[in-house]
């Protein structure tokens, strides 16, 4: 971009409001496959008991996923995506576009933030399972050598990077936070195996700090406070794809 350029403030003058929406990676990849200015789906905005409900439905033509991580695959992407609406939080966020002639235009000011999430379904669970399996495959492969390795390495009690890692781990005194989407993937994968988990087991599975894990669990799960499953967590109804077991008080 040029150091000096023309700035079109039409969007600011018209007080144009825009939404800033986070979408899953697979959804943006499917959108990119749409030809020309074709339709990628439908956005529905409705009122339910005074609350705004927003959802996106992906076009059926774009639902087929043919590769995952560069590997051939055959799976259908979830079509229904409810929005989780979030406030702007006192921030002033703006959207700019840049033309081929380096002209900047202010398109509008962000008035609403949201996260577009897939509705829990068999298709979504299958897609996440394939993604998790692909990401867990080793990137290094064993190879048979034709020649004898002549380089001599002396054994050491511990490597320097291991020493540094252990030192940092002791200094931190806590687990490092992983990406939120990665934690969600691990949780959904765990809840495919069992309906109920106590917090300690979920901490062991995800290797996440307790406070951070509980923040994420509150978005997708329910903590049981009574009955035979007291003090355990399970998925909220909208994220389940199994038959709910009967609870007793």
Curated annotation (Swiss-Prot):
Gene Ontology cellular-component terms listed: microtubule cytoskeleton; transcription factor TFIIF complex
Record-linked InterPro entries: TFIIF_beta, TFIIF_beta_HTH, TFIIF_beta_N, TFIIF_interaction, WH-like_DNA-bd_sf, WH_DNA-bd_sf
Subcellular location: Nucleus
Record keyword Nucleus present: yes
GO MF annotations in UniProt: DNA binding
List of residues that carry N6-acetyllysine: 22, 33, 137
Signal peptide start and end residues: none
Keywords: Acetylation, DNA-binding, Nucleus, Phosphoprotein, Transcription, Transcription regulation
Superkingdom to which the source organism belongs: Eukaryota
Biological process terms in GO annotation: positive regulation of transcription by RNA polymerase II; transcription by RNA polymerase II; transcription elongation by RNA polymerase II; transcription initiation at RNA polymerase II promoter
Modified residues (Phosphoserine): 142, 248
Chain positions with N-acetylalanine modification: 2
Principal place of residence: nucleus
Classification via CDD domains: TFIIF_beta
Pfam families: TFIIF_beta, TFIIF_beta_N
Binding site for DNA: 227, 229
Similarity remark: Belongs to the TFIIF beta subunit family.
Subunit text: Heterodimer of an alpha and a beta subunit. Interacts with HTATSF1 and URI1. Interacts with GPBP1. Interacts with GTF2B (via N-terminus); this interaction is inhibited in presence of GTF2F1.
The protein, known as: General transcription factor IIF subunit 2
Organism annotation: Mus musculus
């Amino acid at each position: 971009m040029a150091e000096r350029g023309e700035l079109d403030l039409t969007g600011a003058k018209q007080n144009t409001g825009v939404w800033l929406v986070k979408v899953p990676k697979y959804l943006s990849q499917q959108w990119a496959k749409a030809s020309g200015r074709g339709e990628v789906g439908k956005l529905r905005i409705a009122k339910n008991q005074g609350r705004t409900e927003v959802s996106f439905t992906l076009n059926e033509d774009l639902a087929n996923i043919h590769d995952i991580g560069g590997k051939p695959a055959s799976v259908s992407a979830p079509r229904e995506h409810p929005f989780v609406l979030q406030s702007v939080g006192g921030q002033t966020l703006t959207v700019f576009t840049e033309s081929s002639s380096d002209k900047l235009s202010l398109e509008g000011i962000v008035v609403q933030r949201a996260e577009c999430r897939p509705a829990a379904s068999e298709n979504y669970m299958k897609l996440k399972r394939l993604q998790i399996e692909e990401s867990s495959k080793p990137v290094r492969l064993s190879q048979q050598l034709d020649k004898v390795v002549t380089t001599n390495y002396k054994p050491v009690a511990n490597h320097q990077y291991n020493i540094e890692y252990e030192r940092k781990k002791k200094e931190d005194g806590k687990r490092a936070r992983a990406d939120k989407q990665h934690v969600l993937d691990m949780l959904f994968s765990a809840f495919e195996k069992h309906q109920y988990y106590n917090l300690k087991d979920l901490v062991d599975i995800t290797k996440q700090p307790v406070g951070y894990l509980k923040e994420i669990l509150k978005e997708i799960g329910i903590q049981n406070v009574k009955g035979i499953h007291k003090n355990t967590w399970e998925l909220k109804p909208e994220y389940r794809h199994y038959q709910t077991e009967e609870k007793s008080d």
